[in-house]
């Protein structure tokens, strides 16, 4: 399989403090990578570097197969919609095509079709004319995932997508993301605190550690590694 993203000896800082040191890993098209790690280990900094919005202190990130940073569909951490936010579901999803639209004043019929297909794929097409504030937390995340899907050519980057959702909505969203990976062959990079779900769904694990070397490998290799002992043990408490 073709490499879609390669990170070589990446070093990056947050507020002048080095949080990522000589990190190397790569993922191929169609893989599902979960990024784990304790608070302060550099997960958010890595996301910003992967998106191209934060320069690294050293090393390099290479996107493969002609992919550009604007071709990455990004779903940020869940935050409640602002009171009075006027946009409809279809307007929010269509905004995911801004990178495709460029400097044109209006969206093309092809871009509108991409948005419609994304809403259908996420099961929210019947909510297209609803206001964002009318949606449940799970529906809002599906809407934002549909927007990210409009941007994504081959890669989705999801930052703790189930944070704040109830168990039912979380399970449904995990299932949708898995289908996008398995059926649509979309490459997934997901930051997560849920080790059990990460081991269940991912094909690769990247664990960032603030006090020791980082880990990159398969879920099976991670589960049997010394690095996993602390994290898995903590979640069993």
Indicate where each model-derived feature is located:
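H-loop/switch region of ABC-family ATPase nucleotide-binding domains
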Residues: 192-193
